[in-house]
Amino acid sequence: MDLDLERGPPGPRRPPRGPPLSSSIGLALLLLLLALLFWLYIIMSNWTGGALLVLYAFALMLVIIILIIFIFRRDLLCPLGALCLLLLMITLLLIALWNLHGQALYLGIVLFIFGCLLVLGLWIYLLEILWRLGATIWQLLAFFLAFFLDIILLIIALYLQQNWWTLLVDLLWLLLFLAILIWMYYHGQRHSDEHHHDDSLPHPQQATDDSSNQSDSNSNEGRHLLLVSGAGDGPPLCSQNLGAPGGGPNNGPQDPDNTDDNGPQDPDNTDDNGPHDPLPQDPDNTDDNGPQDPDNTDDNGPHDPLPHNPSDSAGNDGGPPQLTEEVENKGGDQGPPLMTDGGGGHSHDSGHDGIDPHLPTLLLGTSGSGGDDDDPHGPVQLSYYD
């Protein structure tokens, strides 16, 4: 299993959360039943306790909510259970403040204000949890308004001191926490499923590397290979480097003028396929072992279709090279090698007989304009095509 460089090595899988013990569930259900009975007794009795009746009923409702959270969602006891416990302590403090006087009353009021601030902080923390779980701004606003609406209704119930109003307020508090529990149950489960990390799947970086390697291999397989064979000890005429700056292949050691060199270098930094020429330099400042071309270039590559010139002082073959399966290597001449065309195809054969159709083809052509009197066809041009 590959290591995730961003996440680090995967840790051990967390064991599934087991259900709570049957004894704890039974005890919680028993306490929930007793709390409901006590709450109904206070609400339905004719006890004239005034505002204390409302506070006792509200305290029992908070106990009921805590028991429900413990039974169904124990993992939410920290945010929701702590909020209910803090509200329960504030309710008990209000019941105690109802009969206090003097400095104890002032101290109780300070504690009450401090408790209200804690309740507000816990509620904001709970809304942040809902936001992280994917709640929209409208859902958060609805929970926020429902919370403050219940507080206002509780204050009204303390003022009215009516049993039916107290029953309505307590049920609204229960509905608020049940709505939060249900929302966190569904959205929290979906959030955990979306962010579950499956180690069996490849990492995105690994998948990218695999695809790039595959594309590189495909591009390498798609490249055309030009098969050539050398004549004697001379370098080949054509190679895989088809991007030489001179417009043609670079078949030998490169000269300072970035031209092809199949033989010793001349003083004019041009291509030479044989020893230095004893003849004077041409006016085009280039080396010329044959008739001068009008394009001021070296005419040492594949020559125009001229007859063989045996009087060349350098020993070069002045005629055009034959692209056959053999090339004669005369003394001192490191002329161009042959092209292996896979079946004895000729360079001037426009039909490409015997050539492998999957390999690129090197054609010889002329510029179409005449040069010197000895070279009526102009320089030879090399064409590369698939």
Curated annotation (Swiss-Prot):
The protein's location, in the record's own words, is: Host cell membrane
Q: Which residues lie on this side of the membrane: Extracellular?
A: 45-51, 97-106, 161-163
Q: Which gene encodes it?
A: LMP1
> What's the PTM story here?
Ubiquitinated on the N-terminus.
Region (Disordered) residue ranges read 194-386
What residue ranges are annotated as transmembrane? 24-44, 52-72, 76-96, 107-127, 140-160, 164-184
Organism whose genome encodes this protein: Epstein-Barr virus (strain Raji)
Q: Biased composition, Low complexity: where in the chain?
A: 209-220, 251-267, 357-366
Which Gene Ontology BP annotations are present? symbiont-mediated activation of host NF-kappaB cascade; symbiont-mediated suppression of host JAK-STAT cascade via inhibition of host TYK2 activity; symbiont-mediated suppression of host TRAF-mediated signal transduction; symbiont-mediated suppression of host type I interferon-mediated signaling pathway; symbiont-mediated transformation of host cell
According to the record, the residues making up region (CTAR1) are: 194-232
Q: Which domain of life is it from?
A: Viruses
Subunit structure, as described in the record: Interacts (via PXQXT motif) with host tumor necrosis factor receptor-associated factor (TRAF) proteins TRAF1, TRAF2, TRAF3 and TRAF5. Interacts with TRAF3; this interaction activates B lymphocytes. Interacts with human protein ZMYND11; leading to negatively regulate NF-kappa-B activation. Interacts with host UBE2I; this interaction induces the sumoylation of various cellular proteins. Interacts with host IRF7. Interacts with host TYK2.
* Record-given protein name: Latent membrane protein 1
Q: Which UniProt keywords apply?
A: Activation of host NF-kappa-B by virus, Host cell membrane, Host membrane, Host-virus interaction, Inhibition of host innate immune response by virus, Inhibition of host interferon signaling pathway by virus, Inhibition of host RLR pathway by virus, Inhibition of host TRAFs by virus, Inhibition of host TYK2 by virus, Interferon antiviral system evasion, Membrane, Oncogene, Phosphoprotein, Transmembrane, Transmembrane helix, Ubl conjugation, Viral immunoevasion
Topology feature Cytoplasmic, residues: 2-23, 73-75, 128-139, 185-386
